[in-house]
Swiss-Prot record:
Changing residue 104 to H: No metalloendopeptidase activity. PANTHER family: LEUKOCYTE CELL-DERIVED CHEMOTAXIN 2 (PTHR11329), LEUKOCYTE CELL-DERIVED CHEMOTAXIN-2 (PTHR11329:SF0). It comes from Homo sapiens. Highly expressed in adult and fetal liver and weakly in testis. Not expressed in bone marrow. This is Leukocyte cell-derived chemotaxin-2.
Length: 151
């Protein structure tokens, strides 16, 4: 009886720690956060030149398929920059109590339903704009809170 309860509890804890979102990038077994490089660090609130980082950077190879983290609606395009550089693209997704902005992807669509784990788009070539940076998807909650626990 005790071992059954222990196994059940261990399963619940590992599920909770894994977060409710799907893996973001094809070819990755988990949502690994970008470490530090000369362009900064990928964790939430990492200091940037003028402000703290408002999202989390998930490692992903350029050209890789990017997946929806949860079931919801793609509600529009998001652009992280004021210019028209090669990586200035992304989407906003809302649903299941979540709202996120995902940057540096070429989405398959800018509006409409999407399911958790469904192809959302393709990672853009960050190296063209930031040589030496670790390629990644930027994901941030719409309310600027820390998304790390859901990853």
């Amino acid at each position: 009886m005790f071992s059954t309860k222990a196994l059940l509890l261990a399963g619940l804890i590992s599920t909770a720690l894994a977060g409710p979102w799907a893996n973001i990038c094809a070819g990755k077994s988990s949502n690994e956060i970008r470490t530090c490089d000369r362009h900064g660090c990928g964790q939430y609130s990492a200091q940037r030149s003028q402000r703290p980082h408002q999202g989390v950077d998930i490692l992903c190879s350029a050209g890789s398929t990017v997946y929806a983290p949860f079931t919801g609606m793609i509600v529009g395009q998001e652009k992280p920059y004021q210019n028209k550089n090669a990586i200035n693209n992304g989407v906003r997704i809302s649903g299941r109590g979540f709202c996120v902005k995902m940057f540096y992807i070429k989405p398959i669509k800018y509006k409409g339903p999407i399911k958790k784990g469904e192809k959302l788009g393709t990672l853009l070539p960050l190296q063209k704009v930031y040589p030496g940076i670790q390629s990644h998807v930027h994901i941030e909650n719409c309310d600027s809170s820390d998304p790390t626990a859901y990853l």
